[in-house]
């Protein structure tokens, strides 16, 4: 099939129609999107080849893999920048706290708490335990949730990044932390970290430590099941 160029708006219309309907025939897609049939056929063929679509019994439907990516595709196609959820971990051993010096923006070169993005299918404790191990080699154990905080980073008073932090506490049995690939790691005196004696610590992380180290928060974890007949059940 010869390459046919679709505009971003045409691709968005096709994707939007497939998100809003579980199954659509080709003619229904033509009606829903108002995209020329040759362009539509090309895009559907491309999406099927990339395993984004399944074509069966004369209808097209998003694959389960594609449905997992709906929130991300929507932001890209609409050119939206969303809030990024990040799991943070407070790792202490005796009177020390373990910090990571960031190698990447934002906050490149600053020391801060361990953390990262959640992989689909992980629980929050699984995420932060994995992140700590990947970043310093320690097998940390999740202990509790401390807080949920929304942080916005601005540049010249204009929004640059927006984060939703889930702050947690983890326990470790040793101080044998080693640098991996994410940046340098080091133990610092906890009190000196709070009073500003340690240079280049992310200011909001210092605030989190001062405010939430001894706090506890409740976060519910629920699992929903979607069935072939479109019914939903809440698992216990």
Residue ranges and their predicted role:
Residues 34-48:
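Short amphipathic alpha-helical interaction segments
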Residues 4-9, 17-37, 120, 180-236:
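Nudix hydrolase/Nudix homology domain
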Residues 7-12, 111:
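Short, leucine-enriched amphipathic alpha-helices that occur as contiguous helical runs
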Residues 31, 35-37, 96-134:
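Conserved Nudix-box catalytic region and its N-terminal flanking loop in Nudix hydrolases
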Residues 48-58:
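A short, conserved structural fragment
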Residues 59-88:
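Acidic, metal-coordinating catalytic segment for phosphate/diphosphate chemistry
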Residues 118-141, 151-204, 235:
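Unchanged
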Residues 1-4, 86:
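Short, Lys/Arg-enriched N-terminal segment that forms or immediately precedes the first helix
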């Amino acid at each position: 099939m010869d390459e046919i160029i679709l505009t971003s708006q045409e691709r968005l219309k096709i994707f939007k129609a497939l998100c809003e309907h579980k199954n659509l025939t080709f003619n229904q897609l033509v009606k829903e999107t108002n995209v020329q049939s040759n362009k539509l056929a090309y895009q559907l063929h491309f999406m099927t080849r990339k395993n984004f679509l399944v074509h069966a019994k004369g209808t097209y439907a998003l694959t389960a893999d594609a449905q997992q990516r709906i929130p991300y595709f929507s932001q890209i196609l609409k050119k939206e920048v969303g809030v990024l959820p990040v799991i943070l971990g407070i790792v202490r051993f005796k009177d020390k706290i373990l910090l990571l010096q960031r190698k990447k923006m934002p906050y490149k070169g600053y020391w801060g708490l361990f953390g990262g993005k959640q992989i689909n299918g992980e629980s929050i404790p699984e995420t932060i335990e994995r992140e700590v191990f990947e970043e310093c080699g320690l097998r940390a154990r999740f202990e509790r949730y401390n807080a949920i905080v929304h942080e916005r980073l601005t540049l010249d008073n204009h929004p640059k990044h927006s984060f939703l932090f889930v702050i947690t506490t983890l326990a470790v049995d040793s101080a044998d932390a080693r640098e991996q690939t994410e940046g340098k790691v080091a133990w610092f005196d906890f009190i000196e970290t709070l009073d500003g004696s340690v240079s280049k610590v992310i200011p909001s992380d210092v605030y989190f430590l001062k405010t939430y180290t001894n706090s506890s928060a409740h976060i519910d974890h629920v699992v929903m099941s979607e069935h072939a007949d479109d019914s939903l059940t809440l698992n216990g």
